[in-house]
Swiss-Prot record:
Regions that span the bilayer: none
Native source organism of the sequence: Abutilon mosaic virus (isolate West India) (AbMV)
Function: Pathogenicity determinant. May act as a suppressor of RNA-mediated gene silencing, also known as post-transcriptional gene silencing (PTGS), a mechanism of plant viral defense that limits the accumulation of viral RNAs.
Residue spans of biased composition, Low complexity class: 38-47
Protein name as catalogued: Protein AC4
UniProt record, GO biological process: symbiont-mediated suppression of host innate immune response
Renumbered residue ranges of the record's region Disordered: 1-24, 36-79
Keywords carried by this UniProt record: Host-virus interaction, Inhibition of host innate immune response by virus, Suppressor of RNA silencing, Viral immunoevasion
Length: 79
């Protein structure tokens, strides 16, 4: 799958580091971007999953937009 085409990378400079090979018995660990930088716990996706896991939370938060709209309509000055 990983075939190197020299024609595709004509501008790429090949240095000694590109031909690096591990020493016998040396351990190589390739970490993905997510493993190196885990998502913060305050991200919207993680809080959304917590709400979906708890039935009471999902029910109460579903009513919040309607409640907020009702309060806004009460406190808005009419012109």
């Amino acid at each position: 799958m990983c075939s190197y085409s020299s024609k595709a990378n004509t501008n790429a400079r090949i240095t000694d580091s590109s031909i690096w090979s591990p020493q016998p018995g040396q351990h190589i660990s390739i970490q993905t971007y997510r493993e190196l930088n885990p998502a913060p716990t305050s991200s919207p996706t993680s809080t959304r999953t917590e709400i979906q896991l708890n039935g009471e939370n999902s029910r109460s938060t579903a009513d919040l937009p309607g409640e907020a709209n009702r309060l806004l309509m009460i406190h808005m000055p009419r012109r």
